[in-house]
Amino acid sequence: MYQSLAMAANHGPPPGAYEAGGPGAFMHGAGAASSPVYVPTPRVPSSVLGLSYLQGGGGAAASGASSGGGSGGAPSAAGPGAQQGSPGWSQAGADGAAYTPPPVSPRFSFPGTTGSLAAAAAAAAAREAAAYGGGGGAAGAGLAGREQYGRAGFAGSYSSPYPAYMADVGASWAAAAAASAGPFDSPVLHSLPGRANPAARHPNLDMFDDFSEGRECVNCGAMSTPLWRRDGTGHYLCNACGLYHKMNGINRPLIKPQRRLSASRRVGLSCANCQTTTTTLWRRNAEGEPVCNACGLYMKLHGVPRPLAMRKEGIQTRKRKPKNLNKSKTPAGPSGGESLPPASSASSNSSNVATSSSEEMRPIKTEPGLSSHYGHSSSMSQTFSVSAMSGHGPSIHPVLSALKLSPQGYTSSVSQSPQASSKQDPWNSLALADSHGDIITA
């Protein structure tokens, strides 16, 4: 925009084209080139410039023409350029964002002096500062505009020369702020455990209260269960009733079903072989037919069906011996067996001695004179000699019985000390013989 003004100032018509004034009626080329007022404000978008000058273009041109006419003595807005100045500014504002300067025309009207151009630039800067929030200069206007924009609320109203543009932006920002603030104000975050709102926490804590409060199954009345379930109406069910309802679709019956009949009394079953209905164990044959335990075992062991003649009305049980008796007898048996061999050996030895002695005594009794020929032991010879000398037959029998019983009487001593058995036997017989001899002789 300012470049077009500079070009118009440099390449404008010569003095006196439209006015009768001297060279001061129009701005000079050198002054226009060196004037600092033609520097545009920093980072001002063209759309804002177009919108800002859309309404004030004609007024600025009129004020510039009137000031120029007053200073230079030219009639105010009398030339045709003044009449065509407003269409030029309005065309520039109507273009919007893409601003294109109008073509340079010799009939375009400009202010007469450099001072009037400076006043026009100052007025434009003031309007821009007012639009951005009332800053002193170009940089101050930009900073103040940013601060004013940052401090403004999302739903606030803006007083600006372009209300349509900022109203749309403000409305969109307000809607975005409301949308972004919506999730944070929703009751979802208030129900988090970290919140201090007890009313919002209560619904979430109901799940944990189920474990602390006492529950009762509405179907069976159970007070404890591994897992609490709920039916379609929300009532509590124990794990068993809940699973039954889930699988079968009906409530679990409260009456417990009767126990399955024992195998011996199953209704409708009979042995395919013997036609019995009572057994301790039902089996199946090769064809899959039920058979009693007896027929099934017989077929399994012998490979042939059990004969009907072996059928019995009652169930025959096996007579088992008690295991305690076997355990009590087994430890006593070996001990008795171990103690028996020495006793048997001692008794056999003693019996052998007794038989030999009895055999020797028999010929002695018949032939007393031959007693000297059987001198096996002094005790025996003394005994036989005493008996022979006395000649009393009946008195000899107690001695013989004592002699026969003496080995048996000392079997216990022999079993206790078998080492001294050989030495004690002659001495025992001698002592008995002497004692009986004394009795006999007396």
UniProtKB/Swiss-Prot annotation:
First and last residues of each zinc finger (GATA-type): 217-241, 271-295
UniProt GO MF annotations: co-SMAD binding; DNA binding; DNA-binding transcription activator activity, RNA polymerase II-specific; DNA-binding transcription factor activity, RNA polymerase II-specific; RNA polymerase II cis-regulatory region sequence-specific DNA binding; RNA polymerase II-specific DNA-binding transcription factor binding; zinc ion binding
Record lineage: Eukaryota, Metazoa, Chordata, Craniata, Vertebrata
GO biological process entries: aortic valve morphogenesis; atrial septum secundum morphogenesis; cell fate commitment; endocardial cushion development; intestinal epithelial cell differentiation; male gonad development; negative regulation of transcription by RNA polymerase II; positive regulation of DNA-templated transcription
InterPro entries, alphabetized: GATA_N, TF_GATA_4/5/6, Transcription_factor_GATA, Znf_GATA, Znf_NHR/GATA
GO cellular component, one term: nucleus
Subunit description: Interacts with ZNF260. Interacts with the homeobox domain of NKX2-5 through its C-terminal zinc finger. Also interacts with JARID2 which represses its ability to activate transcription of ANF. Interacts (via the second Zn finger) with NFATC4. Interacts with LMCD1. Forms a complex made of CDK9, CCNT1/cyclin-T1, EP300 and GATA4 that stimulates hypertrophy in cardiomyocytes. Interacts with NR5A1, ZFPM2 and TBX5. Interacts with TBX18. Interacts with PHF7; the interaction promotes GATA4 binding to its transcription targets.
N6-methyllysine sites (modified residues): K300
Protein's job: Transcriptional activator that binds to the consensus sequence 5'-AGATAG-3' and plays a key role in cardiac development. In cooperation with TBX5, it binds to cardiac super-enhancers and promotes cardiomyocyte gene expression, while it down-regulates endocardial and endothelial gene expression. Involved in bone morphogenetic protein (BMP)-mediated induction of cardiac-specific gene expression. Binds to BMP response element (BMPRE) DNA sequences within cardiac activating regions. Acts as a transcriptional activator of ANF in cooperation with NKX2-5. Promotes cardiac myocyte enlargement.
Extent of Gly residues compositional bias: 62-73
The protein's name in its UniProt record: Transcription factor GATA-4
Biased composition (Basic residues): 317-326
Key word Zinc-finger present: yes
